Amino acid sequence: MRTLGTCLVTLAGLLLTAAGETFSGGCLFDEPYSTCGYSQADEDDFNWEQVNTLTKPTSDPWMPSGSFMLVNTSGKPEGQRAHLLLPQLKENDTHCIDFHYFVSSKSNAAPGLLNVYVKVNNGPLGNPIWNISGDPTRTWHRAELAISTFWPNFYQVIFEVVTSGHQGYLAIDEVKVLGHPCTRTPHFLRIQNVEVNAGQFATFQCSAIGRTVAGDRLWLQGIDVRDAPLKEIKVTSSRRFIASFNVVNTTKRDAGKYRCMICTEGGVGISNYAELVVKEPPVPIAPPQLASVGATYLWIQLNANSINGDGPIVAREVEYCTASGSWNDRQPVDSTSYKIGHLDPDTEYEISVLLTRPGEGGTGSPGPALRTRTKCADPMRGPRKLEVVEVKSRQITIRWEPFGYNVTRCHSYNLTVHYGYQVGGQEQVREEVSWDTDNSHPQHTITNLSPYTNVSVKLILMNPEGRKESQELTVQTDEDLPGAVPTESIQGSAFEEKIFLQWREPTQTYGVITLYEITYKAVSSFDPEIDLSNQSGRVSKLGNETHFLFFGLYPGTTYSFTIRASTAKGFGPPATNQFTTKISAPSMPAYEFETPLNQTDNTVTVMLKPAQSRGAPVSVYQIVVEEERPRRTKKTTEILKCYPVPIHFQNASILNSQYYFAAEFPADSLQAAQPFTIGDNKTYNGYWNTPLLPHKSYRIYYQAASRANGETKIDCVRVATKGAVTPKPVPEPEKQTDHTVKIAGVIAGILLFVIIFLGVVLVMKKRKLAKKRKETMSSTRQEMTVMVNSMDKSYAEQGTNCDEAFSFMGTHNLNGRSVSSPSSFTMKTNTLSTSVPNSYYPDETHTMASDTSSLAQPHTYKKREAADVPYQTGQLHPAIRVADLLQHITQMKCAEGYGFKEEYESFFEGQSAPWDSAKKDENRMKNRYGNIIAYDHSRVRLQMLEGDNNSDYINGNYIDGYHRPNHYIATQGPMQETIYDFWRMVWHENTASIIMVTNLVEVGRVKCCKYWPDDTEIYKDIKVTLIDTELLAEYVIRTFAVEKRGIHEIREIRQFHFTGWPDHGVPYHATGLLGFVRQVKSKSPPNAGPLVVHCSAGAGRTGCFIVIDIMLDMAEREGVVDIYNCVRELRSRRVNMVQTEEQYVFIHDAILEACLCGDTSIPASQVRSLYYDMNKLDPQTNSSQIKEEFRTLNMVTPTLRVEDCSIALLPRNHEKNRCMDILPPDRCLPFLITIDGESSNYINAALMDSYKQPSAFIVTQHPLPNTVKDFWRLVLDYHCTSVVMLNDVDPAQLCPQYWPENGVHRHGPIQVEFVSADLEEDIISRIFRIYNASRPQDGHRMVQQFQFLGWPMYRDTPVSKRSFLKLIRQVDKWQEEYNGGEGRTVVHCLNGGGRSGTFCAISIVCEMLRHQRTVDVFHAVKTLRNNKPNMVDLLDQYKFCYEVALEYLNSG
């Protein structure tokens, strides 16, 4: 409408009625408008009004005068409509409609829009042909309509008013239908219908009578289709012109009715409607059909009866081309079928049909293509010139003349090598397909043949249409060596001093076996004192003998037997197996006369002599006391000569045992003969040597036991006999009086002294006796129960002796690798001599710390009573030298008087300073716990918010660091109500590091609210955006971008979230937390604000972190630590920092581990040079740094106690353990979930962390025959996607093949299905599909097994670093591709020890290099050993980890 409005101009001045003849349809509105045949629409919002001011004057100056049709827009909302309909006109002669209109407004704003429509033949209304919407003029104007519809069409003119919401008037008057042409507007002649094919231009020619001037607008108007612009105007005379319009790129949507329009200064001219018909070129709906096919032709049916588009069809064509070619050919077709000839055999073609209708552009696009292939043709001939190139014992190589497509006449063909030979009197026929046909010198090698065999060979060229054969050749394979004797057939029956060896002849003899050669050699013995140098030899046996008895061997010795078979060509490969002779019982010394050295009523003293070992060292000596009872026969005595089952004296009566163990000694404590007293009332290795009872008779036995390889052999000898003491007769009273009087005085004096002495001793020994009673009760429980509870342990419990005083010096300083110094200290327990790191002591005046340390200064707010806190100054708790730390911790843990418990209890508990702000009612809701709140003197004060006088409070306190005031803020874990305050504090304090030492939820309780976003979050005026997350096994590092409204600054803040703290207690080991502390130190900017540290309450774990961080700095700078005074200082700043004794002890253990181990990480750029230096041998110590590092690792590796492995030691689980000395601890067991009958949920396996993922590895032993089903339950239950196998299948060592080579193996409900296998260098990879048949809804899992062949059993390390690194990378790639790195990896070797640990350690080191560009082999192995002490158990394996890291760096 706006376009039409702009094309119209005001027709000012045309106030006179045009002269000439008029037709019906006009109206002057002097009479009612209905008399003129005018009407109004029923659906209008309001009606036009007929006004006559002559008969009904008005005083409204805005209303025109006269008689007219009026719309008063006052009070009418915007958008309301009213229509005035003229009568239908059927004027075929030239005529003109003339009318006047009036527009006025009281606000100078248009009162509405006046439109004129022309509706033809009661058709759609269409768009307005004329409108006026300009500013009101308050004068009458004239307009004319030149309408050309032509007979038999009729039309109707409609006036429409659309209100604008403004007050005013719109009126029309003097509507006339004149019988002559319009004076200012051209008339169109009749326009004709147009038909085109889709995609072509449709041109409409509109001839008009009249003049056109510049400024007139012409266009082609359609109904429900697009308008077309003017193409050109051609003036044919002074009063005639032709206007052309193009509808471009026609489609079916353009078909419809169009009319010509011209807008002039005086009015509008319109033509009749013409139809645009758009025809769609025909396209077949279906592809042509294949009637028949040959090698060189295709016969098709056009199949073009059904089409898309319009007919009629005037022509047909077939277009075809090769599917891979760029050319095509088009052939006209005059029938419904067509044969395409002269085609190539076995070639794919695409064939389409094209149809044409009349008119330009009438040819449609090609129809759907038929894609088909010609048949192959019979090969021209068979292969020629077949000849033998090379003959070997197991293979022959043949060659033939090359050929190509012109011979095969087919792209799909097989060249098959057909050969036959006899095996065992039976004809064997084989076929192999050769794919080397395109080689310029084609040849094929037939392998896996038997030696000395005639083989007939021919080639067969085959395609789907036929086959051609070559001539046949016959050739004989060469002679060969025999195969190996089957390893599983080498069986040995072992005795103490002989082995009976049996074997079978090789499965593949390849001739007559003439000889067997057996080489034997002693490789190891359980007894290190045995000389094995003479225990070797070689034996030859004739080919028909397959057994031999070896005698004169040593007990307890492992012998290696290697057998080779020989034919006339020589010896075949060896087969080796090992067998171990049984150990013998120790040889006890002779005791010809059972005469004791001394004897009292309660004791017997005998001389104990060392026993002679036989095959295994003596493990232990034991003293057994047997009570002589009535009715014991000699036979029974002989049967019970030796005593394999130890029984404590306390349990002997409970068990009704006739004997008990009085003492037990380690073998090294009895190197020479020495006396021993039975009944001395002391305890030896847990056995109470109780005094003998005088009225009983005893036999004293001395026995020695040797233990090795699961065997225990005992020998014993009776060393003494004690008879019962006969009671002396009682003397007569009168003879006794003098004697009694004489001794009474002596006895009274002695008794007085004893009473005083006992009073003192009882007080001193009270706790010691209590401890002994506890140990005795514990020992009894261990004998009477199967399972014991797991207990936490520390370094002192793991490897120290509380009765010995010693000191240590670590081979690693706090900053890095080992250093050397002339001074050294000796550890008595293992004679380890190491050096003092000079960097501990930068200044001689600081070698010993005192209460001058800032950490030890008293605080103003401390309120203590002397009676409650006996130690108030640093003088009673001086700093401890790092060199003395191990001794100090050992003494504190083993102390019978003042130990960690007493030291921790000396700390002031509870409030020690005012906390009035925290106690305000307005601040109570800001505290997570009512008893852990902020002291006033050290609390963090936030900037006050407007209108809130308490908005400066947050539950957090400043804590001083090492020579850095207010270096930390200890705070609680944010609550939902305090998240905004928390970020306010972080921003205000310019904090760059947040340390979080809790999980959000622990044991079902919320410990901290999640105060950070996963993407972006706005906390009032602070915007926090997560930009990076680094997930590691025991902690997460998140990086945020933080902005504050109104401040043009973006700060980067890191959150260090330690996730490895258990729900109860403290971490089992400090290794992970120490690595976490080092990360915080390395990534915290030195000039930033305080470190914000929080757990849940902000006291216990928070205190642990801060104390450890401060003490590491102190140890590095001063060579001392002052843990006690540091904790005391922290508690003066915030209540109850370090909340439990357990945490206090853990801090000591963590600092000790840090001092022992140091920071062993190496930047990637320095690995090569440092590793070279680490391997240099020190001529003075004859050792190297890497050896010392490995020794340190062994020293700090915890030893598993019996109670740690209680589940593995249950009797029902014994048969599931390959080695009883390599057991998984209870805390890292993966309990089996899948139910399998009565089977237990135990498997000998342990969960291990990788660098980035907790419990990423499961380390286990090679499945035993009875645990294969448990192994697959483990794989399924723990979502394992990779299995790494680092040992060989060896049934002799109970290492069966546990997987299927094809088909499906069923292990209870678990089904393992073989999918595929591949061999690449030293790695066999097999893919299996496993699923639980009892739970089909769970679906299946794909598991890839990687069997590594490059680690022979006789080597401590793999043969190749490159191939082992390739194994690591293949496992990583499969893990990432199959399960996004989320699945676990099962790693197993023979016993789940050194080899498995080496794989896990190297995998961790490679992850370190990828993500941190550092190498820390020590930390990687230490982390693994925290769960299993036998991980990476050899120095060579430890070195190999470094060497693979170098290989990783070299490979890029």
Curated annotation (Swiss-Prot):
Superkingdom in the source lineage: Eukaryota
Underlying gene: Ptprm
Listed GO CC annotations: adherens junction; lamellipodium; perinuclear region of cytoplasm; plasma membrane
Reaction equations catalysed: O-phospho-L-tyrosyl-[protein] + H2O = L-tyrosyl-[protein] + phosphate
Domain Ig-like C2-type: 186-277
Family in the record: Belongs to the protein-tyrosine phosphatase family. Receptor class 2B subfamily.
Glycosylation positions in this chain: N72, N92, N131, N249, N406, N414, N454, N534, N544, N598, N651, N681
Species per Swiss-Prot/TrEMBL record: Mus musculus
Tissue specificity as recorded in UniProt: Most abundant in lung, less in brain and heart.
Membrane topology listed for this record: Single-pass type I membrane protein
Name listed for the protein in its UniProt record: Receptor-type tyrosine-protein phosphatase mu
